[in-house]
């Protein structure tokens, strides 16, 4: 492979039933970085023979103890930036290696409180509804319905990371909304 001594540096892991299909399937989610020595070219990206961090998010549908379907997302722009290739214009947020949750408690290998999961899902759906409905008079008012004032946004390369509601609006939401008309979630 392209990476020598490859490690999976997992920051988030959880599983649960999928709302999109009426809670009829179980999916497992994992996020973090693959870390290794970038020693050989990878899909046209030249190797630099240095440590590299490849951000990933993967989702697996599990049936009868086996993986039946997988979706894998990797931040190729981040890998390209690590070798000095910048194929898109300057991002509005900061380019960083994204850490896991602040309290380092994102690895949920055991069963969790069902009510807490339902409450979290309701909050996520409310946030998506707020974005789709456009019912608030300002971006600040919209975001404060669901987000903490000192929220962190760990956007992919090309967008970048930002911190606090005000900077999120300035560095991500405003540029994204003015450049992407007609967006919808689920």
Briefly describe each language-model feature range.
Residues 1-186:
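C-terminal and inter-domain tail/linker signature
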């Amino acid at each position: 492979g392209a990476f020598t001594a490859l490690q999976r540096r997992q920051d988030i892991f959880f599983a649960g039933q999928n709302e999109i299909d009426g809670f009829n399937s179980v999916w497992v989610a994992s996020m973090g970085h693959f870390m290794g020595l970038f020693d050989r070219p990878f899909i046209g990206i030249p190797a630099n023979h240095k440590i590299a961090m490849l951000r990933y998010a993967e989702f697996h549908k599990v049936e009868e103890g086996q993986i039946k379907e997988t979706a894998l997302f990797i931040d190729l722009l981040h890998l390209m930036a690590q070798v000095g290739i910048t194929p898109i214009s300057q991002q509005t947020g900061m380019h960083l290696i994204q850490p896991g949750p602040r309290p380092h408690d994102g690895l949920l290998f055991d069963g969790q409180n069902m009510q807490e999961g339902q409450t979290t899902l309701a909050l996520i759906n409310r946030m998506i509804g707020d974005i789709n409905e456009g019912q608030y008079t300002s971006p600040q008012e919209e975001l404060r319905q669901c987000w903490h004032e000192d929220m962190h946004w760990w956007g992919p390369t090309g967008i970048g990371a930002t911190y606090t509601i005000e900077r999120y609006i300035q560095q991500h939401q405003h540029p994204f909304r003015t450049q992407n008309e007609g967006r919808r979630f689920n």
